[in-house]
Regions:
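Short, flexible, solvent-exposed loop/turn segments with mixed acidic/basic and small polar residues
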Residues: 12-15, 234-240
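ATP-dependent small-molecule kinase catalytic core of the GHMP/sugar-kinase superfamily
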Residues: 93-234, 249, 253-286
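ATP-binding N-lobe of GHMP and related small-molecule kinases
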Residues: 1-65, 79-89, 258-261, 272-286
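Catalytic-loop motifs flanking and including active-site residues across diverse enzymes
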Residues: 35, 73-74, 174, 218, ...
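Gly/Ser-rich oxyanion-binding loop with an adjacent helix/lid
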Residues: 48-130
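Short cationic amphipathic helices and targeting signals
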Residues: 238, 243-250
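Residue-level signal for inorganic ion chemistry
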Residues: 10, 190, 241
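Short Gly/Pro-enriched turn/cap motifs at secondary-structure boundaries
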Residues: 1-2, 128-130, 238
């Protein structure tokens, strides 16, 4: 799901005084390009650009804390470089560039409910922003940077978790259920497959060596509160990425009640209500 309110911006410029590219993230110069280097090199290869450039990225929400900052961040960089160098890349080429930096980034190029096809890495919007106007309530339980990144965590899990293979083998079945639920706007089915897939992913991480424990006590309190609301008849479900933050999806008519209930949980740092959002786009040509 692409959302509004939480977003990343990117600005690109030349700097002839430098010998190599520079990435500035949230006003802090990074020691290297890190995971975005393959994306930068791929994009610059279209015009054989050799001059060093400066990429300035800003996330308006905590970075590397389980809120998909790499997805939105890489997507914004792809759009910025495509415009700066006048590459005029196709949608498929933009997706190819984004996925080199983050496996989640292609989805942030598109609006609404987005499907990334594993066969050819094509990407498409299944339902646009206004076609199924659900609410997403983000419960931030920590702003700390993860001790183990999602990418490194996945590598560890692949090598050490006895549940990894079964989780991967279930993905086709889960994605088909999710696609059916989204296309038919079956809220209960989408909630069922989303929560089940989330639980399986965290089972894989927590059975890795060393165990990858991303959820905290407040995360579990949020889950318990969600279960109570669901039992009382509220249309609601949750998902949690590789981090401690809880994302609640609910019907618009229940949003105020959900927020009120979640405020009763101790140690929640912030509760953010968002809608489905637009894909990555150019906002300033200057």
């Amino acid at each position: 799901i692409t959302i509004d309110t939480l977003y990343s911006t990117a600005k690109v410029s030349f700097n002839s005084s430098r010998k190599k590219d520079l990435w500035i993230l949230n006003d802090i110069e990074q020691e290297s390009l890190g995971q975005i280097e393959p994306t930068i090199n791929y994009l610059k290869s279209f015009k054989a650009v050799k001059d060093p450039c400066v990429i300035e990225s800003i996330n308006n929400f905590p970075t590397a804390a389980g809120l998909a900052s790499s997805a939105s961040g890489v997507a914004s960089i792809v759009i910025a470089i495509n415009e700066f160098f006048n590459l005029n890349l196709s949608e498929k080429e933009l997706v190819d560039a984004a996925i080199l930096g983050s496996g989640s980034a292609p989805r942030s190029l598109y609006p609404g409910f987005v499907h990334l096809n594993k066969k050819d890495y094509s990407c498409e919007t299944i339902l646009d922003t206004n076609e199924w106007p659900l609410k997403i309530i983000i419960c931030q339980t920590s702003s700390d940077k993860k001790l183990v990144s999602s990418r490194e965590g996945m590598r560890i899990s692949k090598l050490t978790s006895s549940y990894y293979e079964a989780w991967v083998n279930d993905q086709d079945n889960d994605i088909n259920k999710a696609l059916k639920a989204i296309k038919t706007k079956d809220f209960d089915l989408l909630g069922e497959v989303s929560e089940d897939n989330c639980k399986k992913m965290h089972k894989v991480m927590e059975t890795s060596q060393p165990p990858l424990i991303y959820r905290n006590l407040t995360t579990h309190l949020c889950i318990q509160k969600i279960k109570e609301m669901k039992f009382s008849g509220i249309g609601i479900f949750y998902t949690i990425d590789a981090g401690p933050q809880v994302k609640i999806i609910c019907k618009a008519k229940h949003a105020d009640q959900v927020i009120s209930e979640m405020k009763s949980i101790p140690n929640i740092q912030d509760i953010i209500e968002v809608n489905l959002g637009q894909g990555a786009r150019l906002i300033n040509e200057g």
